[in-house]
């Protein structure tokens, strides 16, 4: 495991995000003092349902903008970029694995991975996409559409897609949430292994104690508030 | 992977909606193209058809009817004019050529036209193009035989009128025997559709249009002596007989003069015969309006310029064309709305896909382009299919058109207007895709990425 004292990949300071609730009053979901991840770190972030874990990942990915505070990913504060530049930055620097896989149904496994490359500048081309699918054990499923894959296989495709542009930071939002225990463990092991081999920093959010227990570095969201 | 691949994947994923909306665009474009092709083709053929017919002279009535009857073998003859007028025109220094025509019979719906051998020898139905024989020869024509036929016809008319008045009919002295060869030269379409061959005999029916009650001239069958090469004009659909044989048979009597010629011509010389119309070619176009006025000053005849009459006809028909084109455009607009509705309807499932693409790094503008490109692609493919379809429909209909009218529309001819239709389809696609594309542009990524419960 790489030393967490390496160059920081993610730095969050005084991060705040609020939503208006149904009655129109502001509801603060995120108020995070400081958080940092180094190159190659593998950290699990835990918290209760509705505690703002997914919102935090969306803030880091630049999908949502914070009300205040600072986010630095790989030395860049994406909130200071234009929206288009932020999108390009996200494609090149952040891989995202979702609980519900979020594969495009009309595209094959290989095409889904190629889509991951497309917006980040086509890093490595089709060869890398095939190689990634081989790494997740799907070399025989390259041209299958998601509907023809098991849920475990679908999440493997999602992992390959998240790593398509070799991003320094991989965000995983409950990646085992839709899988059974056996599949969940296999997928988690694969994700950690590929991230570890490639030196990708992994931030995984979950409320599953079993997933938590497999990580050395566990951070509770409420401790950061 | 590129944008167009994403677009085609989207279209394939919603194949039924894509197919239906694309088909509606194709139908609208095919209809518009077919209307344009038919309109231009018919107008071109009609205008081309008038090229050899500088001026047509016939009985007073509708000039358009006279033109349709003489030039296109359509409609009925407005009446007869005197043979004397024909002779006068033939001898007029301003006239280069005068060809008489008489109509009144048909064979299987094909008009039988009585004329002289001048029609084959000197008449150019289009500049530089005379009727040419594919087989056989032209019919024999002798002017003395025609004069004799006129006498016979006048005598029959006199006998009939006496009978109608209840007077005793005194038989006319037997005319000196004159040979009236019943010979016919048939147009290429007539030969093709009736199967008549050279040397074969046929029996004509009275009237210019077929009718179950029509009297057949069984006593005088005509013999095919020549078959013309295709001209792609009304000539192909006509049977030409010598004028003397036309007046030799029962039923083709000289009509009582409807109106007198100019008073100075009235009594001096009895009218020897009649014809339905005369086609006149002038020595120079400068004589056209003088002769036109002279003829129209007469009480028994009128002159018409076929080209001018056809232009007038198409000015009227043009309004119907515009109406049909408006209908085609309406179909296109409805197709555009259908595309917009179809994409809108799929937006709920698309929003998740859009959110995924955004999470993967796609810009809002990229998402906007994908949706817009999809609508434009459907329209362009639909329009392209419609363009080809329109030409194919006209090409397929040409067989029927040829049977019905004797000419074909150049189905492969691409008109400039068709490129405008394609441009309109692109604009229509862009307009119909604009609303859904804006919706896609505004998609809330975070909300649509959340797992659906």
Model-identified regions with their sequence ranges:
Chain B
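Short helix-to-coil transition segments within interhelical loops
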Residues: 11, 358-365, 443, 452-453
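Short, strongly hydrophobic transmembrane alpha-helices
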Residues: 17-41
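Hydrophobic, regular-secondary-structure patches
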Residues: 36-131, 137-138, 142, 154-180, ...
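Hydrophobic secondary-structure segments that place a key small or acidic residue at a functional site
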Residues: 106-116, 126-257
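Short helix-loop junctions at transmembrane helix boundaries
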Residues: 384-424, 434-447
């Amino acid at each position: 495991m790489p030393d967490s004292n390496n160059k920081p990949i993610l730095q969050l300071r005084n991060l705040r995000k609020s939503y208006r609730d149904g009655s129109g009053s502001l509801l603060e979901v995120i108020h995070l003092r400081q958080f940092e991840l180094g190159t190659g770190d593998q950290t699990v972030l835990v918290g209760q349902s509705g505690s703002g874990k997914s919102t935090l990942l969306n803030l880091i990915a630049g999908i949502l903008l914070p009300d205040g505070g600072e986010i630095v990913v790989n030395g860049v504060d994406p909130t200071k970029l234009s929206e288009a530049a932020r999108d390009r930055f996200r494609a090149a620097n952040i891989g995202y694995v979702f609980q519900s896989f979020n594969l495009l149904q009309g595209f094959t496994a290989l095409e889904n991975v190629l889509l991951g490359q497309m917006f980040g500048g086509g890093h490595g081309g089709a060869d890398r996409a095939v190689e990634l699918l081989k790494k997740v054990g799907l070399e025989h499923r390259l041209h299958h559409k998601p509907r023809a894959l098991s849920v475990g296989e679908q999440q493997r495709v999602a992992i390959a897609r998240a790593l398509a542009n070799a991003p320094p930071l991989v965000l995983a939002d409950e990646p085992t949430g839709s899988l059974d225990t056996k599949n969940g463990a296999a997928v988690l092991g694969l994700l950690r292994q590929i991230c570890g081999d490639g030196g990708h920093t992994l931030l995984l959010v979950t409320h599953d104690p079993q997933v938590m227990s497999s990580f050395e570095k566990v951070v509770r969201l409420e401790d950061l508030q | 992977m590129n944008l167009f691949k994403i677009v085609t994947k989207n279209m394939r994923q919603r194949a039924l909606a894509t197919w239906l909306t694309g088909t509606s665009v194709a139908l609208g474009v095919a209809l518009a193209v077919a209307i344009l092709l038919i309109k231009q083709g018919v107008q071109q053929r009609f205008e081309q058809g008038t090229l050899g017919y500088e001026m047509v002279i016939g009985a007073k009535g509708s000039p358009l009817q006279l033109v349709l009857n003489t030039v296109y073998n359509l409609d009925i003859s407005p009446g007869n004019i005197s043979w004397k007028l024909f002779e006068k025109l033939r001898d007029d220094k301003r006239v280069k050529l005068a060809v008489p025509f008489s109509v009144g019979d048909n064979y299987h719906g094909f008009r039988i036209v009585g004329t002289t051998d001048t029609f084959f020898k000197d008449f150019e139905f289009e500049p530089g193009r005379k009727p040419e024989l594919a087989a056989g020869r032209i019919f024999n024509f002798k002017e003395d035989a025609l004069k004799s036929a006129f006498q016979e016809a006048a005598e029959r008319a006199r006998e009939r009128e006496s009978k109608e008045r209840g007077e005793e009919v005194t038989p006319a002295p037997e005319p000196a025997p004159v040979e009236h060869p019943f010979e016919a030269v048939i147009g290429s379409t007539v030969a093709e559709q009736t199967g008549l061959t050279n040397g074969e005999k046929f029996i004509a029916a009275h009237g210019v249009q077929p009718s179950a009650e029509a009297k057949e001239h069984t006593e005088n069958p005509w013999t095919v002596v020549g078959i013309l090469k295709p001209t792609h004009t009304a000539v192909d659909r006509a049977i030409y007989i010598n004028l003397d044989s036309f007046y030799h048979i029962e039923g083709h009597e000289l009509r009582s003069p409807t109106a007198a010629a100019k008073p100075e011509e009235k009594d001096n010389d009895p009218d020897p015969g009649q014809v339905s119309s005369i086609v006149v070619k002038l020595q120079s176009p400068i004589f056209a309006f003088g002769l036109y006025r002279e003829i129209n000053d007469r009480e028994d005849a009128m002159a018409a310029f076929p080209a001018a009459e056809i232009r007038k006809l198409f000015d009227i028909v043009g309004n119907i064309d515009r109406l049909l084109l408006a209908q085609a455009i309406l179909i296109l607009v409805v197709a555009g709305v259908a595309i917009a509705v179809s994409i809108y309807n799929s937006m709920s499932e698309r929003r998740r896909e859009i959110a995924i693409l955004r999470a993967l790094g796609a810009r809002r503008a990229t998402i906007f382009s994908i949706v817009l490109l999809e609508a434009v692609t459907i329209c362009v493919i639909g329009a392209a299919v419609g363009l080809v379809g329109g030409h194919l429909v006209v090409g397929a209909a040409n067989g029927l058109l040829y049977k019905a009218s004797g000419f074909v529309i150049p189905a492969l001819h691409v008109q400039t207007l068709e490129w405008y239709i394609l441009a309109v389809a692109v604009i229509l696609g862009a307009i119909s895709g604009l609303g859904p594309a804006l919706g896609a542009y505004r998609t809330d990524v975070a909300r649509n990425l959340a797992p659906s419960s």
